[in-house]
């Protein structure tokens, strides 16, 4: 017999369907608060919601006339008829939530409107009827208190208590969704566990945008890792945030269409500006923030949270095609559409929504994301040269020797060192085998073994200034190398000459300055040895007296390096001065002694060396004539008060004393490199690079106008200057100009140290009179000012400073500099320096070539006996029948019998063989699954395993790491990238290129320095 169910049972049955867990109970209360216009919503939980739930808001409140109907079933003020659902704009509309909460818990509501003097506290029974009503004090708004949730349902209550932590975690996820989308609304959640004080688990500050709320909910780091996304058509408008892909610049940040940069010169990188997905966080270089699960993906329809598995699946699949498999993006998308285009009345929790023209929405989002991410791959964060630092020399030398990298494509690839290099920077200069450019000590002169206590080793720079300026005018950077610390050497005793004698390096003391007295210097103990540059110097014992390149080949090994690091003072290329202390620079000298190591006849080398010696001696004579009593730059000159200057000098002497004590401690720590015991020797050596003709040819190579294969560069002479052989006679002055020691020879270009720790001991100041630490501080201030410039401008300017938009066509215009570590190509475009992965670049080229040739390389292999696919279900058979042309295009051929029973309709008659690899039944099953899971018809148009096969084949036939490339081969790699559809990453996800440094910062630093000099001069004049 059919009978009507009693009201209490109906209440419990229906209420249990509407409120089925903790998160839905709190969600309904939050939606009521937001619908009431609340700008502050506070959620309070006790024992994670098991004992007590309270939601407090400052909304409009409930009018007294609505108290009775407030908790009645299907009573609402938000719609009157079913047709109103097509225009509903509020979260709630069915009038079921409060009635169900009253049935499942103890419910108390306290509310007040702006027209009431006091609030009313309403206690409801299980049927939603008011039991008691009392006036209480409260501001305008509503408070809903729930206790003992689900206690009337024994099974559900026990399940609720047992899984309370899971319920609580699910609640927080839903709270995060509302906190993100509710702009200009402050949402706060507190929880009190046991007797401990309550803790805030979520809080927003009524942000005006989703990104503001995101920072409050998930932190700044996540905000910096998300790009803004916008896509729209005539029906839909999508706004939100999504993870960067992390390709190209390491951040994958998106920019506008390339048309924004079309007006700029094609030879320079275009600066990114505003876009459909402009990244406000692009000032900070934070990489892609992918997750191992899709736990932070939030979708909204007109600001209503909902779940859409198809949309999430398409986004995740597309993201993994750009990033890597198993990674999921953070997604926050709000889809705006007309209210009559979707149906929210599908499930009790309203989190499932049916959307008209769903395929159009999916295509809009996927196409927009694909375009954005493809563009983002060509955006590179620019690394300012002032931020480019090297490893400190105090690191473990053994590990450094094992990990040193070398630039090897050309015999001489110069280490770039510019004015803005800061203190403690390290330069690694490679020594190539079969290259005669090397560094050693020339100490064979008896007079050079010991010097007076006042003499100090100094350095000279003999770069041809006119030629350097010409290079700079052509858009290239100067080749100046600034060596900062003495070279590390292994202990070895002997003297190296082009004779029958075995190469030896004699013991050489150097002046160890003691600071007890400013003018007191004493020679260091004889056990401080000059150590040879090359670690395996024992090989040189077999060198012949012919001076041929074989002797150098025996001495120099491929993997040997000379490391230098800055001393106590930073340096700039131009307008650089040393100001001496009360100690004069040297007492007597015969000039500078040079030594040559040649691979040609000795007569030619001696003539070249004599010319350089004459030029250097002439330069020293000019230097003596240009002595000036005043500091030219005066960066630390606060006035003419001599007492202040003396005090500053005393402070500087104390600082140098501490520094030298630290150096003496470091000297006692012996190290072992390549089997030789080493000390941190304070001797100073000067590396002199090759001749000007070689540099000119090198410049032509770097600019793509010189063929290395047809005209290889072999340096004629390697010149060496010893610290003890080079003494400047400057008795009558305590200052000299660095520019005056640059030689004007047209035969050779000498590049030497500009800053020496020993000179810091002799000279009280450098760089126009500032001390080492002051100088470092000044350089740091210059760099920091340049780094802070973007923050002083608007957002658009900041993004333009920190991002570069790289077009594919630029690859053809790049100038090959050389090969680094036998694995990377260094190339230059304008003022920007890039590093290209030779293997990834060639692999991507081969992959796209193979992909384009797939259709022509598919061979269908017929079967003698067609194979019945009896494991197929009726659904899978239908998928094959509907996509039979797609299967046939990829080499699969079927015999279909529509009259046969299920599981016997389809027989495989031929399978494809592509590039020697056959595909079979397993590939058919996998392909069927991919087609079934795809939300967009025709999106899976290739055999799933085909891409991995082509990627593996392309990898094996590509240029491998460790392969030496010629200039033409490197240029071909770059030219090939310009022809690709997507040249930014290889099929396995490795980026093909990174931005190394923007060299234009050098000019900014120089300009900043000049401005400071002008200010100091103005202060002195005043």
UniProtKB/Swiss-Prot annotation:
Region span, Disordered: 251-282, 390-527, 622-676
Q: Which GO terms describe its biological process?
A: mismatch repair
* GO molecular function terms attached to this record: ATP binding; ATP hydrolysis activity; ATP-dependent DNA damage sensor activity; DNA binding; mismatched DNA binding
Composition skew (Low complexity), residue ranges: 436-469, 647-664
Q: Which residues form a coiled coil?
A: none
Which SMART domains does this one have? DNA_mis_repair, MutL_C
Entries under InterPro entries matching the protein: DNA_mismatch_repair_CS, DNA_mismatch_S5_2-like, HATPase_C_sf, MutL/Mlh/PMS, MutL/Mlh/Pms-like, MutL_C, MutL_C_dimsub, MutL_C_regsub
Q: Where in the cell is it found?
A: Nucleus
Q: Which PROSITE patterns match?
A: DNA_MISMATCH_REPAIR_1
Q: Write the record's keywords in alphabetical order, separated by commas.
A: Cell cycle, DNA damage, DNA repair, Nucleus
> Looking at the record's lineage, which domain of life comes first?
Eukaryota
Polar residues compositional bias, start-end: 403-412
What the protein does comes down to: Component of the post-replicative DNA mismatch repair system (MMR). Heterodimerizes with mlh1 to form MutL alpha. DNA repair is initiated by MutS alpha (msh2-msh6) or MutS beta (msh2-msh3) binding to a dsDNA mismatch, then MutL alpha is recruited to the heteroduplex. Assembly of the MutL-MutS-heteroduplex ternary complex in presence of rfc and pcna is sufficient to activate endonuclease activity of pms1. It introduces single-strand breaks near the mismatch and thus generates new entry points for the exonuclease exo1 to degrade the strand containing the mismatch.
Give the multimer and partner information. Answer: Heterodimer of pms1 and mlh1 (MutL alpha). Forms a ternary complex with MutS alpha (msh2-msh6) or MutS beta (msh2-msh3).
Protein name per Swiss-Prot or TrEMBL:
Mismatch repair endonuclease pms1
Name of the coding gene = pms1
């Amino acid at each position: 017999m059919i009978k009507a169910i009693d009201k209490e049972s109906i209440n419990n049955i229906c209420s249990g369907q509407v409120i089925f867990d903790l998160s839905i109970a709190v969600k309904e209360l939050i939606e009521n608060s937001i619908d009431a216009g609340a700008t502050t919503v506070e959620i309070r939980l006790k024992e994670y919601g098991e004992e007590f739930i309270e939601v407090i808001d400052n909304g409009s409140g409930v009018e007294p006339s609505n108290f009775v109907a407030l908790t009645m079933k299907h009573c609402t003020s938000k719609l009157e008829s079913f047709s109103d659902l097509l225009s509903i704009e509020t979260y709630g509309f069915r009038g079921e939530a409060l009635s169900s909460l009253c049935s499942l818990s103890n419910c108390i509501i306290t509310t007040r409107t702006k027209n009431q003097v006091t609030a009313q506290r309403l206690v409801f029974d299980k049927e939603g009827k008011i039991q008691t009503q009392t006036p209480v004090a409260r501001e305008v708004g509503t408070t809903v208190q729930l206790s003992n949730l689900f206690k009337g349902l024994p099974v559900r209550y026990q399940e609720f208590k047992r899984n309370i932590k899971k319920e609580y975690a699910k609640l927080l996820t839903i709270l995060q969704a509302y906190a993100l989308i509710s702009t200009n609304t402050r949402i706060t959640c507190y929880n009190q566990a046991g007797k401990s004080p309550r803790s805030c688990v979520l809080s927003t500050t009524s942000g005006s945008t989703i990104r503001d709320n995101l920072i409050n909910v998930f932190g700044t780091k996540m905000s910096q890792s998300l790009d803004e996304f916008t896509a729209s058509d005539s029906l839909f408008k999508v706004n939100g945030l999504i993870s960067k892909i992390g390709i190209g610049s390491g951040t994958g940040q998106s920019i506008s269409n390339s048309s924004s940069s079309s007006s700029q010169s094609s030879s320079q990188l275009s600066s990114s500006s505003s876009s459909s997905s402009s990244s406000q966080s692009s000032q900070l270089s934070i990489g892609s923030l992918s997750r191992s699960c899709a736990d932070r993906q939030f979708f909204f329809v007109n600001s209503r949270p909902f779940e859409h598995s198809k949309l999430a699946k398409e986004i995740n699949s597309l993201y993994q095609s750009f990033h890597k498999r198993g990674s999921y993006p953070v997604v926050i998308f709000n889809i705006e559409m007309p209210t009559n285009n979707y149906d929210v009345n599908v499930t009790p929790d309203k989190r499932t929504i049916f959307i008209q023209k769903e395929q159009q929405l999916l295509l809009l989002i996927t196409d927009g994301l694909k375009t954005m991410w493809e563009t983002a791959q060509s955006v590179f964060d620019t690394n300012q040269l002032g931020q480019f630092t090297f490893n400190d020399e105090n690191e473990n030398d053994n590990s450094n020797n094992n990990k040193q990298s070398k630039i090897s494509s050309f015999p001489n690839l110069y280490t770039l060192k510019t004015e803005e290099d800061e203190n403690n920077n390290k330069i690694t200069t490679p020594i190539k085998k079969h290259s005669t450019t090397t560094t050693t000590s020339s100490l064979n002169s008896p007079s050079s073994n010991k010097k007076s206590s006042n003499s100090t080793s100094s350095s000279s720079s003999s770069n041809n200034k006119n030629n350097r300026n010409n290079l700079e005018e052509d858009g290239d950077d100067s080749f100046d190398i600034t060596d900062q610390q003495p070279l590390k050497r292994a202990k070895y005793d002997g003297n190296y000459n082009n004779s029958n004698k075995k190469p030896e390096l004699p013991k050489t003391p150097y002046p160890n300055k003691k600071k007890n007295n400013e003018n007191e210097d004493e020679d260091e103990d004889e056990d401080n040895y000059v150590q040879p540059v090359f670690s395996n110097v024992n090989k040189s014992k077999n060198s012949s007296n012919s001076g041929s390149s074989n002797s150098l080949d025996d001495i120099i090994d491929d993997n040997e390096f000379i490391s230098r690091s800055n001393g106590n003072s930073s340096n700039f290329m131009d307008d650089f001065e040393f100001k001496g202390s009360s100690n004069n620079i040297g007492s007597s000298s015969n000039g500078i002694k040079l030594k040559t190591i040649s691979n040609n006849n000795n007569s030619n080398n001696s003539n070249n060396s004599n010319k350089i010696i004459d030029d250097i001696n002439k330069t020293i004579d000019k230097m003596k004539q240009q002595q000036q009593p005043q500091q030219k730059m005066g960066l630390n000159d606060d006035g003419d008060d001599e007492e202040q200057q003396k005090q500053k000098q005393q402070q500087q002497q104390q600082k140098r004393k501490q520094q030298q004590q630290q150096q003496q401690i470091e000297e006692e720590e012996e190290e072992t490199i390549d089997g030789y015991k080493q000390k941190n020797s304070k001797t100073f050596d000067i590396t002199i690079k090759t001749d000007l003709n070689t540099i000119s040819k090198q410049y032509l190579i770097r600019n793509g106008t010189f063929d290395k294969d047809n005209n290889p560069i072999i340096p004629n002479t390697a010149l060496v200057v010893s610290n003890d052989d080079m003494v400047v006679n400057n008795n009558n002055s305590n200052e000299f100009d660095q520019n005056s020691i640059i030689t004007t020879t047209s035969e050779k270009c000498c590049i030497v140290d500009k800053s020496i720790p020993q000179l810091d001991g002799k000279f009280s100041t450098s760089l126009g009179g500032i001390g080492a630490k002051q100088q470092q501080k000044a350089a740091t201030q210059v760099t920091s000012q340049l780094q802070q410039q973007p923050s002083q401008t608007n957002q658009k300017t900041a993004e333009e400073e920190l991002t570069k938009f790289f077009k594919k066509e630029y690859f053809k215009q790049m100038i090959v500099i050389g090969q680094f570590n036998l694995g990377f190509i260094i190339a230059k475009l304008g003022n920007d320096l890039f590093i290209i992965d030779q293997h990834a670049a060639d692999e991507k080229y081969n992959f796209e070539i193979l992909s384009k040739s797939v259709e022509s390389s598919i061979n269908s292999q017929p079967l003698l006996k067609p194979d019945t696919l009896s494991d197929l279900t009726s659904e899978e058979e239908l998928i094959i029948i509907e996509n039979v042309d797609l299967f046939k295009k990829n080499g699969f051929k079927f015999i279909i019998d529509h009259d046969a029973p299920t599981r016997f309709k389809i027989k495989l008659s031929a399978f494809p063989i592509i590039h020697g690899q056959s595909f079979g039944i397993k590939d058919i099953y996998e392909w069927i699954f991919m087609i079934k899971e795809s939300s967009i018809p025709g999106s899976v148009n290739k055999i799933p395993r085909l891409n991995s096969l082509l990627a593996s084949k392309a990898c094996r036939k590509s240029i491998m790491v460790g392969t030496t490339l010629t200039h033409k081969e490197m240029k071909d790699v770059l030219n090939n990238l310009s022809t690709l559809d997507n040249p930014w990453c290889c099929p396995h996800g490795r980026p093909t290129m990174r931005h190394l440094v923007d060299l234009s910062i050098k000019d900014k630093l120089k300009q900043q320095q000049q401005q400071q000099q002008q200010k100091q001069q103005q202060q002195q004049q005043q």
